[in-house]
Amino acid sequence: EDADSKSKHKPANVIDVDKDGSTDDDWRRANVDSVICNLYKAIQEVKPWVRFGMGIPGNWTMKSKAAAAYGISLPSGISAMESYDYLYCNAVEWAKQGWVDYLNPQIYWSTQVTRQNYRVLCQWWSQTVCENFSNKLPNGQRVQFCVSQAAYGATDADAGLSGYGDGVVEIQRQIDANRDNLSSGYTGSVFFNTSSYILLFKDLKESHFQHKALIPPMDWKSKTQLSAPTHITLIDTLLSWQHPSAERFTIYAYPRGMTFETAKNDPQYLKGVVYGYNIRLDGYGDLSQQTIAVCSYDRYGVEHAAAFYEGNEVFIPKQVIFWELNGGTIDVELPTY
């Protein structure tokens, strides 16, 4: 059946898989690669801000020959279903070529088992795949890495997943393992499935997700510089502003005297993402003693210029735009308001 399919659909300019020494499995992977590559390119042409990624089984392969072709090692002691061989999904190639915005390996095994250990696989994806490939793409592009975790293993005893007897504690151990790999590429968690995650939500909110967070930015795609919001007003707890083009904004409230950069790096000061031009800041303490920042926030998850409110005073820092011109730069300083 494969031979008939190859004979019917293989383009004339493609070398015969038998003659070049590759196998039917290589041919299948090449076809999957083609779908991923062409779909990614099509999305970039129409809506480049749409995030395109793939959820694949948490174990890439156990074949040393496949790893050697990419100059990488395999995770030690792992024995599990392989996406490379069973599904013909070569996620390492997608990361190397930058054909996806994110990879979502489904590591549905626990930290308590040996042959499919969560920590080992999480570290391999973030350090081996991200550091060797997705963090070395041209023009600042990165393939972001977020693990899919088996929330259902912690809530459904009938799921039969080994090592999940501790319930939410196992999920917390996994999140800790993820965060151990922040420097090499980890950007977040995906939980399967929603109904199970809802049962864990209260515990996780109290332990690991106490504050709001922004999605990882795709700053290499963002091309337009958004100006700061204007006409900020605060009436009681209703904060309002105006902007000619931006449609969503990030809001911060932090102690006066603290720098904005410091506040941005501490999630307790992020008060929300707003689609629109106002927000209620109820429950955030005495606003008269805080600096409130409103940041233009684009579709790529990139924060742009901010405006600041302190009491009745609104101020917008000087903004500098750089134009590249014949190898040099021209600095244009916009006025403050």
Language model: regions and residue ranges:
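Extracellular low-complexity, O-glycosylation-prone stalks/linkers
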Residues: 246-268
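Conserved aromatic anchor
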Residues: 236-246, 332-334
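Substrate-binding cleft of secreted/luminal carbohydrate-active enzymes
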Residues: 88-115, 125-221
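Short beta-strand segments within Ig-like beta-sandwich modules, predominantly Fibronectin type-III
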Residues: 269-276
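Proline-enriched interdomain boundary motifs that mark the N-terminal boundary
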Residues: 223-232
